[in-house]
């Protein structure tokens, strides 16, 4: 059964790119998803690759510094990954646009702002995150992958994405450029979100506020809605778009 799955996967990936590179990226993703070093069996379960295949690729990743060996039999991400992350931060033009506006929201007393983009059909990626000046239960960090089908930011991405989801809630989000989530991703947390667009009003991602659910009473939400729509509108204008509401 394993052979059949792996062979099918190789054929599909070869048509789209280089199978060895795809496998190396699978291994890196498996290590990135874990908070502790992983052994060969754990990497194999996470990637559905043979251990012999993983060992060959790991040697190349070790030589290039993308992976380090820990305790002789476990592996973790290496220093090259950190260097790439730092280079990305330096070169990312969106960082210089988003973070000052998000900091202004924090300084005004908002809940914790984040900016999310769709990563896969089931995941979103937190690209930027600042913590509010209040206590918060919502432990989200830049770089975190979160379910796209739960949470306010996920709803916005589904409503305005390349394949817009249908339904009454999605229609309401598209009409108002606003989504709310109460205890969906975490029963103690809540959030609101608004879309950010680029030229020709293409969706870039979702700007959100999140925090403890008790601070998202109707009056709080109405107040925060004005702030998040204003910020999303400002970002859209800076990116060459025209905000729909």
Tell me the role of every PLM-derived stretch.
Residues 2-89, 234-238:
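N-terminal helix-turn-helix
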Residues 121, 176, 199-200:
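Residue-level recognition of short loop/turn positions
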């Amino acid at each position: 059964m394993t052979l059949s799955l792996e062979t099918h996967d190789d054929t599909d990936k070869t048509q789209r790119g280089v199978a060895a590179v795809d496998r190396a990226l699978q291994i890196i993703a498996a290590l990135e998803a874990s908070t502790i070093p992983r052994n060969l069996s754990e990497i194999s379960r996470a990637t559905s690759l043979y251990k012999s295949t993983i060992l060959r690729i790991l040697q190349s990743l070790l030589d290039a510094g993308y992976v380090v060996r820990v305790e002789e039999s476990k592996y973790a991400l290496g220093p090259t990954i950190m260097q790439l992350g730092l280079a990305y931060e330096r070169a990312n033009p969106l960082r210089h646009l988003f973070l000052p506006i998000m900091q202004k929201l924090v300084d005004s007393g908002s809940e914790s702002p984040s900016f999310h983009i769709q990563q896969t059909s089931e995941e979103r990626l937190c690209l930027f995150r600042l913590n509010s000046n209040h206590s918060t239960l919502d432990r989200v960090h830049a770089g975190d992958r979160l379910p796209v089908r739960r949470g306010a930011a996920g709803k916005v991405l589904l409503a305005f994405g390349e394949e817009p989801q249908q339904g009454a809630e999605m229609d309401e989000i598209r009409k108002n450029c606003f989504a709310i989530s109460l205890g969906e991703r975490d029963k103690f947390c809540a959030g609101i979100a608004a879309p950010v667009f680029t030229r020709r009003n293409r969706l870039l991602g979702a700007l959100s506020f999140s925090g403890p659910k008790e601070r998202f009473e109707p009056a709080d939400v109405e107040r925060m809605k004005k702030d998040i729509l204003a910020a999303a509108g400002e970002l859209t204008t800076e990116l060459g778009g025209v905000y729909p509401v």
